[in-house]
Swiss-Prot record:
Similarity comment text for this entry: Belongs to the azoreductase type 1 family.
InterPro entries (alphabetical): Flavodoxin_fold, Flavoprotein-like_sf, FMN-dep_NADH:Q_OxRdtase_AzoR1, NADH:quinone_OxRdtase_FMN_depd
Cofactor(s) this protein cannot do without: FMN
UniProt xrefs under SUPFAM superfamilies: Flavoproteins
Organism whose genome encodes this protein: Azotobacter vinelandii (strain DJ / ATCC BAA-1303)
Gene: azoR
Name of this protein: FMN-dependent NADH:quinone oxidoreductase
Keywords per UniProt: Flavoprotein, FMN, NAD, Oxidoreductase
Length: 199
């Protein structure tokens, strides 16, 4: 049995294409892996604070020197990191906001990309500590950006995940969703075809 960690980052609950892709992915995954445990963290319902001085203090100060706010910030980071460490499969669902990922997802990444926990520095440079995990990234985009200089989602997420040792990453993009005509239908159909191949 494997554990699947799903991170939802769309601000929308209704009408969200990235959430629609997540539902499609999970339906297929559960059918193929009925005994797997699914853990869902919804960053719209439970926002993760952006990196702040309390979290930095929690990471760097000895426990006896931490304020209550720093202890609370560290406990939150430990909880989020623990979910990632305990997962075999990571699913990131992210609409494209202004060419990149939602700030809520960036905040989550800031909590879990941690020196000494998910990566370490060595004399040969940084080394990811989460090798062996698999990741799927489900994106929803109003235009068509894959492979273009305007796509700051896929390059950043590949870099961030690779930095912590997750190199087996599949991207499923639903593109052209706001372009009118049959672009939305075709974009969704292509994304679902890709999901059927990888999930």
């Amino acid at each position: 049995m494997s554990r699947v960690l799903v991170i939802e980052s769309s601000a929308r609950q209704e009408g969200s294409v990235s959430r629609q892709l997540t539902a499609e992915f999970l339906a297929r995954w559960k059918a193929a892996h009925p005994n797997d445990e699914i853990v869902v963290r919804d960053l719209a319902n439970e926002p993760v604070p952006h990196l702040d001085i309390d979290l930095l203090g929690g990471w760097t100060k000895p426990a006896e020197q931490q304020s209550e706010a720093e202890k609370a910030a560290l406990a939150r980071s430990e909880r989020l990191t623990g979910e990632l460490l305990g997962a075999d499969v990571l699913v990131l669902a992210a609409p494209m906001y202004n060419f990149a990922i939602p700030s809520t997802l960036k905040a989550w990444l800031d909590h879990v990309l941690r020196a000494g926990v998910t990566f370490k520095y060595t004399e040969n440079g940084p080394q990811g500590l989460l090798s062996g995990k698999r990741a799927f990234v489900l994106t929803a985009r109003g235009g068509i950006y894959a492979g273009s200089p305007l796509d700051h989602q896929e390059p950043y997420l590949r870099q961030a995940l690779g930095f912590i040792g997750i190199h087996d990453v599949s991207f499923i993009h639903a593109e052209g969703l706001n372009m009118g005509g049959d672009f939305q239908q075709k974009g969704l159909a292509r994304a679902k075809e890709k999901l059927a191949q990888v999930a």
